[in-house]
């Protein structure tokens, strides 16, 4: 008799028709909360409605129901993204000069928005070249369309329609997977299956599909565009896909088909899968054959990774086992218990994902200029500045969000009884040592980095330039950064013998790429000025981390308030009769962290903007002489606070301040308006709730006198609401001011 192991049964992981689709319910504001569903009696109701609408934890304690709501909301988010993308492509098709730009990208600027002539607003349509009047755009869409092989506005229309179809699909999926077939909790907690599918499906097959598109569509079309062929003469994408001979004319190895692949002569394919390094001198972008090779390699890596985790077949890794085996000699129980946290707390999961995504976004910001991936991106200075700034802000916000959700996890989901002597418990137990050391590091960095500037300002004021820290007096060279640069310059000869240039021209080595007389990229030398400002970066980043980490580590308890966990994530003070306990909630740490994040990112984007204008961006004469936009003044001017104020903020604000009467005038108005929004925030941040309540009561008295009193009783914002409104306007005003300042400047001079 043979004993067979039981066949693994297919688990039913969805529930049919769990929640009725009800339009009556949707039409009732606050239907998710018994208190809010009663309707407003005071004006606080509308604030609570906004605060709690997406706080699914407050609607129900059922983890499965919360998971389904989050899952469904993700489809809604994707639908919005597809609609937004579709709108971008539609603007490119309907209102843009894309085809003209494609024919002459060095002289014509990208525009995809034309302002209607209402009361003189046609002034906003500037001349972007080729007889086209419109607003110059700085999003980089034209460059990415060129790289993907889009040659006509019809193709943009088609893609826009495709985007809308996908948006509709996503909206349907969001409804279907909540109301018709909702996954059970076990499905959300099946991490191995999720890893396999996300790694192999999204990243693996996604990269493979993109690599395929690049090889069969982008490469041939870009090859012909680079050779100066008129876009209208170039075959359509499907012709390259269906007709191999067309491709073989450009890349001879296509004639051999798949033979080299199966005979392992992969080097035959090196005409379209290259490893060159550096930039294409025609477009100033990375070699598209390099990026196709890159995406193919990424696809292979992730397809392998997507087969590593144990599911129905009993082979492969188990995440729980990996975590529990992860112990060191000094780390107690190690990662034991973390698996349970990450499968039952979506806040913990989100915190990790936000921290990693934010860091990745900041890495993207730095690679977009140093390794410009799309054709003609590097000579479009306005777009370069916009993309860097955008990715830095996004990364900053995302990292603060990581701390916010880590703190929410600590307050709502952390169970101290199941976390004994593992790494999380050990970190929490020596949090005082961590925070006090970090605080010391912040004080040290703050005094020393700022002190170097103050020294320079003082010596400058006393007329003693020889006693300043500068490249021409007392040098503080960033020797470690220079060493890193140098090793990368040597890499092509040593570690990558087939590469013709290093990964980025910024490392050094003397190569300069200019396109149409404009510098695309050249070696960036670092000196005393960079050393000084990098220590300001270190200071602001450490203070941001100090505030956020303190908020997380002290979210549940502190010496001041031992029972903080009972008060929740956000609360104004620990009740009456306990003075000095205000602004200690985890939420308040996020609130304060946002201001320091704003400080940190502001210094970074100011540094980038000035450094690039001074040392990289500019024009190349026929004699080979480079003239930079601000003539290399960064090294000597940015070493004093006064230099930053005078030669960066004031000197470069000339364009936005004098923009009236030109096509940049909208930026002048934005600059003023955003300053106003920023100042408006101070009214919320510097004023107490009682002041407003008193004012409101006297205004209500006047309304009563006139018998026009409202049915909904007006109330001053709560302390937390006031701070939330304050920080929102502070950041919006500050970011929009910077945006207007940057764009008016760089569009005028770039």
Curated annotation (Swiss-Prot):
Protein name, per record: Photosystem I P700 chlorophyll a apoprotein A1
Any one Gene Ontology cellular component term annotated for this protein: photosystem I
Subcellular location field = Plastid, Chloroplast thylakoid membrane
Which residues of the sequence carry a binding annotation for chlorophyll a'?
A: 675
Alphabetical keyword list: 4Fe-4S, Chlorophyll, Chloroplast, Chromophore, Electron transport, Iron, Iron-sulfur, Magnesium, Membrane, Metal-binding, Oxidoreductase, Photosynthesis, Photosystem I, Plastid, Thylakoid, Transmembrane, Transmembrane helix, Transport
GO biological processes: photosynthesis
Query: Which organism is this protein's natural source?
Result: Anthoceros angustus (Hornwort)
InterPro entries for this protein: PSI_PsaA, PSI_PsaA/B, PSI_PsaA/B_CS, PSI_PsaA/B_sf
Q: Does the keyword Cell inner membrane apply?
A: no
Indicate which residues the UniProt annotation says bind phylloquinone. 692
Q: What class of enzyme is it?
A: oxidoreductase
- Phylogenetic placement of the source organism: Eukaryota, Viridiplantae, Streptophyta, Embryophyta, Anthocerotophyta
Q: What gene makes this protein? A: psaA
């Amino acid at each position: 008799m043979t004993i067979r192991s039981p066949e693994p049964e297919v688990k039913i992981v969805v529930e049919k028709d769990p929640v009725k689709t009800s339009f009556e319910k949707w039409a009732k504001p606050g239907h998710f909360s018994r208190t809010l569903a009663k309707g407003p009696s005071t004006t606080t109701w509308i604030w609570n409605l906004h605060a709690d609408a997406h706080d699914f934890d407050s609607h129900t304690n059922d983890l499965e129901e919360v998971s389904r709501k989050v899952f469904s909301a993700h489809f809604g988010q994707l639908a919005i993204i597809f609609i937004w993308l579709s709108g971008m492509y539609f603007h490119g098709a309907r209102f843009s000069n894309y085809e003209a730009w494609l024919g002459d990208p060095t002289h014509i600027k990208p525009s995809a928005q034309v302002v209607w002539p209402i009361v003189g607003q046609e002034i906003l349509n500037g001349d972007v070249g080729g007889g086209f009047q419109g607003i110059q755009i700085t999003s980089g869409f034209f460059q990415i369309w060129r790289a993907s092989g889009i040659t006509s506005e019809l193709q943009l229309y088609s893609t826009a329609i495709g985007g809308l179809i996908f948006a509709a699909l996503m909206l349907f999926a969001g409804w279907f997977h909540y109301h018709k077939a909702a996954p059970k909790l076990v499905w959300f907690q099946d991490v191995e299956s999720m890893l396999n599918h996300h790694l192999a499906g999204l990243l693996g097959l996604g990269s493979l599909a993109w690599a395929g598109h690049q090889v069969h569509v982008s490469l041939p079309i870009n090859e012909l565009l680079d050779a100066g062929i008129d876009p209208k003469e170039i075959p359509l994408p499907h012709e390259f896909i269906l007709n191999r001979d067309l491709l073989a004319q450009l890349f001879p190895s296509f004639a051999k088909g798949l033979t080299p692949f199966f005979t392992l002569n992969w080097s035959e394919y090196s005409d379209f899968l290259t490893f060159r390094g550096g930039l294409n001198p025609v477009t100033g972008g990375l070699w598209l054959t390099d990026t196709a090779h890159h995406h193919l390699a990424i696809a292979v890596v992730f397809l392998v990774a997507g087969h590593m985790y144990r599911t129905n077949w009993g082979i492969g890794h188990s995440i729980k086992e990996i975590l529990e085996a992860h112990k060191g000699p000094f780390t107690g129980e190690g990662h034991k218990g973390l698996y349970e946290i990450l499968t039952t707390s979506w806040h913990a999961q989100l915190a990790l994902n936000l921290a990693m995504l934010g860091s990745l976004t900041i890495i993207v910001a730095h690679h977009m200029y140093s390794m410009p991936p799309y054709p003609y991106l590097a000579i479009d200075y306005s777009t370069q500045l916009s993309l860097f700034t955008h990715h830095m802000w996004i990364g900053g916000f995302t990292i603060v969000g990581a701390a916010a959700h880590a703190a929410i996890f600590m307050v709502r989901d952390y169970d101290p009884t199941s976390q004994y002597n593992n790494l999380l418990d050990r970190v929490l137990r020596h949090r005082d040592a961590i925070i006090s050391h970090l605080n010391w590091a912040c004080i040290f960095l703050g005094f020393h980095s700022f002190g170097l500037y103050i020294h320079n300002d003082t010596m400058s004021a006393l007329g003693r330039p020889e006693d300043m820290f500068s490249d021409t007096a007392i040098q503080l060279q960033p020797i470690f950064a220079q060493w890193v640069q140098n090793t990368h310059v040597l890499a092509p000869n040593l570690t990558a013998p087939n590469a013709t240039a290093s990964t980025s021209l910024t490392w050094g080595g003397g190569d300069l790429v200019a396109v149409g007389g404009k510098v695309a990229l050249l070696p960036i030398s670092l000196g005393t000025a960079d050393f000084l400002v990098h220590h300001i970066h270190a200071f602001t980043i450490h203070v941001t981390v100090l505030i956020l980490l303190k908020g997380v580590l002290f979210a549940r308890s502190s010496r001041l308030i031992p029972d903080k966990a009972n008060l929740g994530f956000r609360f104004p003070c620990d009740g009456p009769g306990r003075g000095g306990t205000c602004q200690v909630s985890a939420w308040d740490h996020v609130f304060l962290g946002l201001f320091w994040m704003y400080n940190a990112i502001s210094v970074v984007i100011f540094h980038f903007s000035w450094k690039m204008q001074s040392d990289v961006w500019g024009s190349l004469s026929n004699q080979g002489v480079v003239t930079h936009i601000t003539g290399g003044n960064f090294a000597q001017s940015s070493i004093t606070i006064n230099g930053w104020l005078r030669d960066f903020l004031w000197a470069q604000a000339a364009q936005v301040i004098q923009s009236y009467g030109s096509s940049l005038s909208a930026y002048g108005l934005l600059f003023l308006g955003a300053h106003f929004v920023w100042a408006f925030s101070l009214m919320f941040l510097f004023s107490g709730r009682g002041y407003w309540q008193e004012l409101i009561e006297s205004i209500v008295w006047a309304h009563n006198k006139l018998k026009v009193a409202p049915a909904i009783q007006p109330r001053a914002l709560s302390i937390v609401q006031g701070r939330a409104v304050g920080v929102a306007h502070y950041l919006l005003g500050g970011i929009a001011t910077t945006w207007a300042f940057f764009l008016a400047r760089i569009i005028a001079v770039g």
